[in-house]
């Protein structure tokens, strides 16, 4: 049996303010804190949406790394990126998102943070470039890389300069046809390189563009970097000496929709040679049997090595991520590090030429670990951070790290840590700064473990405003997507458990079979078990809550989930557990087994169900929420959300479910966004999403009556289409 890990403040009343949807969506959103070379200050961006003006404002701030004080650097909304330039503690290169000469282009400006408004233009770029990485060479010149969309001929794509075609037709001879939320074209993402020439003069040196941009990706047919939809600047790196660029691309020589295989390419910064993969099928150092996805290439400080991660399985997107270190120019087999460790890394950086720092998901958190660059496969890395989820980390001159993280109780937390001392000092945290998050703290979260179907399962517990253990609160059962994913101790603007809890629930968020960060065995066991082991874990979790927590009212409980969590809600609707809930919410869940073939990343379904749709159809139908015998059990009121741009799980899945619920006479509602994908990101749409989801749950759980401030379905001003007689 598990035990709830009580925190000292959790059982007492607090003066915390309820976190409501408007506060969540309109609270400031901040980027990682990027330190200057001396480690005195760091810069970060901040954006904030207003429901009064219906606009987003943005700014850049400076964080003092000694005092924690924050001051405004600029509120110019056209400044989209800032990077420190050279070893100077105050000179920065920034991206101006507009271009005075080229519509749709951007400009590079150089400025001093002590007089930011009086910088100068160093370069005019012909398209919308982003993800800048910069090094200063021995000559003083600046070399950089960035990415943009590219035409097939290698020139950068500029949407504002393109003539609209006369026909809207699209023609395909291979897959993908569409991916995530867009239809493929002949364009692709590419990494470009450029140089800023240093000129000495009176006062500070100045920099100006030198030569043309070089497309480093287009010479390799079918290569693309960063790889959409989630690729970004972590997909490539520039060596500290400015001579080399490493980038990730999906394998260019096999069907991209059927395999996860990716290569790390190496190319001179000047593009004088065509990029070659260091881990491709013909590369001399490729480890035997390693054919899966790869990523996060990063050069060592001496530019002689590249660290990266790679999976072995070419059809499993959540396979174990093993760390590798390649020596530039070597033909020896690329060695793996800590390959036997039962955790997958998310990110990697070099501490020095002999040691690395890796970010790793671990037991509901994302932590930092240190590891020697020559570690054997049996090495167990050492953790030096604890709670929350690390989103960025930068080494300071004293070998400590400036860490940016989030937690369930804060959207932004900046602190200093080191492998030797752990967390040393907290500099800033959003719940102490933002009125919208006032009163939030680690006391709002607990966790417990319970016996699942075959192993112990972890679950988070999130308490409502002014929680009182002597009272009773309806259960909100939270089911995550993936399925190889997990609920983390992290902030979310889409599925924030505290917003749900503050309506008047105790949120329980289990990490059942299939969840990541608890070892490969738990994660991998979901294969061909979508409605099996995880469902049984959830049943046992509900039973454990029902038997052990008097302050949780399971009689009036509700459940919600998205993506795989949406599938599970659909599965629960036709299962005995479905009768334990007063209402259900299914967001973008798969419903009809035979419709799985309409997804885009075919490797996913083929791995999850042990074969293709035509060779092993029974496995696809084994866990079919739309099976007739399951439909006959549907009775719990259900809200279905599905959007038109969701090409991962097409909108027809949600419509099919809604049709059946309506014909069966089950209270149901369909919420659709024509301009959203698998996620709801537009701020106004997000508000409607929260109003409808919370309003639906509150209506059937009784929270609407017990909490006068609870969200109601009537809060949404969008008219409801209803042709019932």
From Swiss-Prot:
* GO biological process, alphabetically ordered: proteolysis
Supply the enzyme class, top level. Answer: hydrolase
**Catalytic activity, EC:** 3.4.14.-
Q: A Gene Ontology molecular-function term?
A: aminopeptidase activity
Arranged from A to Z, the UniProt key words for this protein are: Aminopeptidase, Glycoprotein, Hydrolase, Protease, Secreted, Serine protease, Signal
For this protein, the record's SUPFAM superfamilies field holds: alpha/beta-Hydrolases, DPP6 N-terminal domain-like
User: What sections of the sequence does the record tag as coiled-coil?
Assistant: none
An example of a Pfam family matching this protein is Peptidase_S9
The active site annotation covers 563 (charge relay system), 646 (charge relay system), 678 (charge relay system)
| Cell location | Secreted
InterPro entries linked to this entry: 6-blade_b-propeller_TolB-like, AB_hydrolase_fold, PD40, Peptidase_S9_cat
Signal peptide position in this chain? Answer: 1-18
Which is a Gene Ontology cellular component entry for this protein?
extracellular region
Primary localisation category: secreted
Sugar-bearing residue positions: 75, 96, 153, 258, 383, 453, 610
- Domain of life, per UniProt, equals Eukaryota
User: Is Cell membrane given among the entry's keywords?
Assistant: no
The text of the family note is:
Belongs to the peptidase S9C family.
> Function of this protein?
Extracellular dipeptidyl-peptidase which removes N-terminal dipeptides sequentially from polypeptides having unsubstituted N-termini.
Name of the protein described by the UniProt record: Probable dipeptidyl-peptidase 5
Native species: Aspergillus flavus (strain ATCC 200026 / FGSC A1120 / IAM 13836 / NRRL 3357 / JCM 12722 / SRRC 167)
Q: Which gene encodes it?
A: dpp5
């Amino acid at each position: 049996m598990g035990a709830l890990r009580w925190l000292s403040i959790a059982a007492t009343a607090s003066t915390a303010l309820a976190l409501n949807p408007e506060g969540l969506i309109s609270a400031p959103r901040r980027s990682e804190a990027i330190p200057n070379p001396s480690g005195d200050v760091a810069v970060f961006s901040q954006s904030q949406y207003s429901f009064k003006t219906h606009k987003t404002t943005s700014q850049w701030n400076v964080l003092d790394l000694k005092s924690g004080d924050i001051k405004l650097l600029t509120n110019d909304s056209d400044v989209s990126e800032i990077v420190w330039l050279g070893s100077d503690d105050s000179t920065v290169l920034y991206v101006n998102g507009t271009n005075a000469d080229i519509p749709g282009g951007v400009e590079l400006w150089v400025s001093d943070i002590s007089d930011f408004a009086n910088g100068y233009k160093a370069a005019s770029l012909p398209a919308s470039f982003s993800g800048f990485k910069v090094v200063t060479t021995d000559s003083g010149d600046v070399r950089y890389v960035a990415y943009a969309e590219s035409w097939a001929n290698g020139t950068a794509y500029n949407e504002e300069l393109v003539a609209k075609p006369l026909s809207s037709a699209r023609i395909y001879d291979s897959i993908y046809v569409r991916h995530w939320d867009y239809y493929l074209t002949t364009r692709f993402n590419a990494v470009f390189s450029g140089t800023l020439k240093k000129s000495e003069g009176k006062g500070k040196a100045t920099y100006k563009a030198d030569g043309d941009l070089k497309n480093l990706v287009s010479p390799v047919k079918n290569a693309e970097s960063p790889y959409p939809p989630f690729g970004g600047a972590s997909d490539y790196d520039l060596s500290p000496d400015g001579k080399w660029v490493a980038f990730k691309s999906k394998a260019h020589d096999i069907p991209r929709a059927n395999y996860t295989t990716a290569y790390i390419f190496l190319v001179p910064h000047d593009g004088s040679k065509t990029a070659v993969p260091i881990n491709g099928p013909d590369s001399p150092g490729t480890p035997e049997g390693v054919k899966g996805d790869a990523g996060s290439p990063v050069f060592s400080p001496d530019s002689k090595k590249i660290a990266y991660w790679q999976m072995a399985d070419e059809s499993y997107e959540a396979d174990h991520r093993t760390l590798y270190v390649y020596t530039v120019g070597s033909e020896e087999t690329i060695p793996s590090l800590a390959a036997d460790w039962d955790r997958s890394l998310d990110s990697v950086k070099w501490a020095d030429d002999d040691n690395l720092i890796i970010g790793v998901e671990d037991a509901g958190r994302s932590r930092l670990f240190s590891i020697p660059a020559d570690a054997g496969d049996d090495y167990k890395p050492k953790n030096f951070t604890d709670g929350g989820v690390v989103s960025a980390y930068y080494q300071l001159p004293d070998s400590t790290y400036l860490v940016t993280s989030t937690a369930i109780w804060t959207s932004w937390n900046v602190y200093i840590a080191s492998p030797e001392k752990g967390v040393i000092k907290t500099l800033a945290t959003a719940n102490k700064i933002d009125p919208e998050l006032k009163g939030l703290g680690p006391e709002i979260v607990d966790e417990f473990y319970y016996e699942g179907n075959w192993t112990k399962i972890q679950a988070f517990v999130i308490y409502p405003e002014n929680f009182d253990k002597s009272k009773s609160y309806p259960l909100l059962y939270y089911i995550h997507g993936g399925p190889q994913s997990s609920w983390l101790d992290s902030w979310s603007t889409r599925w924030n458990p505290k917003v749900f809890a503050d309506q008047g629930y105790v949120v329980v968020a289990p990490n059942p079979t299939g969840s990541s960060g608890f070892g490969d065995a738990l994660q991998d066991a979901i294969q061909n078990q979508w409605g099996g082991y995880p469902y049984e874990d959830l049943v046992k979790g509900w039973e454990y809550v029902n038997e052990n927590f008097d302050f949780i009212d399971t009689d009036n409980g509700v459940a919600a989930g998205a993506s795989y969590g949406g599938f599970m809600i659909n599965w629960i609707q036709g299962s005995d557990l479905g009768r334990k809930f007063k209402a259900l919410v299914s967001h973008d869940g798969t419903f009809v087994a035979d419709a799985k073939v309409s997804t885009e990343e075919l490797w996913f379904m083929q791995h999850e169900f042990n074969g293709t749709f035509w060779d092993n159809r029974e496995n696809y139908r084994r866990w079919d929420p739309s099976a007739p015998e399951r439909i006959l059990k549907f009775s719990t009121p259900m809200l279905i959300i599905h959007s038109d741009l969701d090409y991962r799980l097409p909108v027809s899945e949600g419509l099919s479910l809604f049709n059946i619920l309506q014909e069966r006479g089950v209270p149901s509602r369909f919420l659709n966004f024509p301009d959203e994908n698998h996620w709801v990101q537009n701020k106004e749409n997000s508000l409607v999403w929260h109003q409808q989801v919370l309003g639906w749950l509150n209506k059937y759980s009784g929270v609407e009556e017990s909490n006068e401030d609870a969200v109601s379905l009537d809060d949404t001003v969008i008219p409801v289409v209803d042709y019932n007689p």
